[in-house]
Amino acid sequence: MNIKQSILKILSDNADKAFSSAELCKLIGTQKTIERQAVKDVLLQLTVERAVLCDAKSGKFRSAKADGTAVFQGNKRGFGFLLIGGGEDLFVAAALTHGAFNGDTVTYRKIPDTRDCAEVLTIVSRGTTTLVGTYDKHNGGRFVVPDDDRFISDVYIPPQKDMNAKHGQKVAVKINVFPSDNRDNPEGEIVAVLGYPGSVDVDMEAVAVSYGLTDVFPQEVEAYAAKQCKLIGEKDLQGRKDLRGQKIFTIDGADAKDLDDAVSVCRNADGTYTLGVHIADVSHYVKPSGEIDKEAFRRGTSVYFPQAVFPMLPHSLCNGVCSLLAGEDRLTLTCQMTIDKKGRVLQSDVFPSVIRSVHRFTYDQVQLILDGDQNARAEFCDVCAELDDMNALAQILADKRDKRGNVDFETKEVQFVFDGGKVVDVVPFKRDFAHRLIEEFMIAANEAVAEYAQTCGLPMVYRVHEKPDEEKLRVLLSIMSGVGIDVKRSKEIHGTVLQDALEKARKTPYFYLINDVMLRTMQKAKYSDTNVGHFGLASNCYCHFTSPIRRYADLVVHRIIKTAVCGKMTEKALAAYEQMASSSATQASAREKIADEAERKADDVCKCSYAETILGQTFVGLISGVVERGVFVELPNTVEGFVSAEKLGAGFVFDKERFCLYNDAVKFGLGDKLCVTVASVNKQACKIDFDLAIEKSQQQSID
């Protein structure tokens, strides 16, 4: 055994102890001066490699055996956190980050005699290799200042690597060299010049690049997709039920192009309904391990920005041959259900099919028909009876889900109005029952497919949603109690408890506030190859089946189900799908998280762009959050800003139980109205600051 191996074995066998170099020499058995020097040289090498740790005070060495692997989250002040999960995030002092940058996956060890402190040992993989920032070129220096202040170092740009970017422009930079510690700058090259900041188009492109989003596909993927865009032939129709004579139609947003679901309904003589949910058969065109499939797996999901879409599949597929366009023959996978008057699914069947949609409806058109608009009903008289039956069935399904404990949150969706590179208005988007109608039908199909897979013992990508964390639930109930809403409590967390709380809140001025806090209390839904149910939907068995154009998880579900219903589920196929379900669930969950973050960021940037147009204007909003350093205020159009405690006045105390700031004269609590003026906007940090518009003593008299 050589010296290096001997040192590592001694330290590994005594992981809780530290040794001086002299002690290690004695244990190894080295006696000569040259041998002792060799031990010291090896210790220095191992310390540089982070295989051995050296205590700065005692000079003793100990094993660098890792306690685990985690993602490092940086902070502009140099320190960081290790995101462990389960509420166990660890603090890393600046001196102990050892070259880790925001987003990196690292190994770490917990520091003895501390509760929540750790040291980074090694970098497993870099989380950020391309970032967006502002080019800073002056006095001979060339650096990119990252937009994300969690990435603590500016990136040095060598000569001839700046693409002739100008000082102050937004650029994308690829990092080629990372330093061994955070005292030096990373080195990179500019790969795209986005333009000068100020235009919302430049801002949106910056968000897209920072999250690695693009609507451009590799040439080989586009070429392969183009080959799929051919007329449906007799071979394509083999083994499919021909539903082209049925009244099947799509209902989507006015701007939607990737129409992946269509519906039909028939009211039977015995009072039951036959509901058909017909989903684009993307699996017919995208084969496992092909070029399109590899790219779709990498992307995981389509991402939607206010003025852009970054699709999972090439446009020739998602907007073309896979999109269920009216009057066009399309290959589909149909889930057909017989449902009784109580919303019970008496029978369900899944089979390959071919359809021809008779109408391409928008939600607004359908809502007009459901509301009895005479012009709309006259224009679409051929399907009014079917839409009326759909309306009745959707009400039945919604009532049934509510009774079993479905928690029906109201999401704050908005539409942005653009003009001249600016956002000039933010308009809250109202969801009417036409949206709920499609939602109910999709949920019914997703449940039926998941239950079929579970009953047959098939591998599956389930959509799971665990119960909320009990501590977060306690905080929620405390907030509700603080605003005078009494909630029944039970030992077992059940959706009916939260549903009851939401209904009580609906009758108060605090509804949207409680709705938002309750949403944050929920666990994040994710994909899994193991079924644990879906808490929010009060469903014991659930999957995503209805959007294979834009979600990779749905595409995998289609492959599994289609193979099974066509009688082709061999042992070899079963084993392959087990592996596919596991890897796809992990990838789809990870990509969904990135997509959600990117979409939120895009919305926040648009709201900041709008806020720049209303600087100095005054509005009345509701306090949506209270922290020790101030209050968050949300305007009626969902734009949120911050009023610092200093602006509220002196002597304020933070009451964390009642979530309010108060002094002898006034109290600022959740849901209170506040008159504010838009003071400043930091678009890069997505932060809006408000000032009080009137004296604090007068705030509570706002009507």
Regions found by a protein language model. Give the residues of each.
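Charge-lined substrate channels and their catalytic hotspots, especially those that engage the 3′ end
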Residues: 1-276, 283-328, 658-669, 675, ...
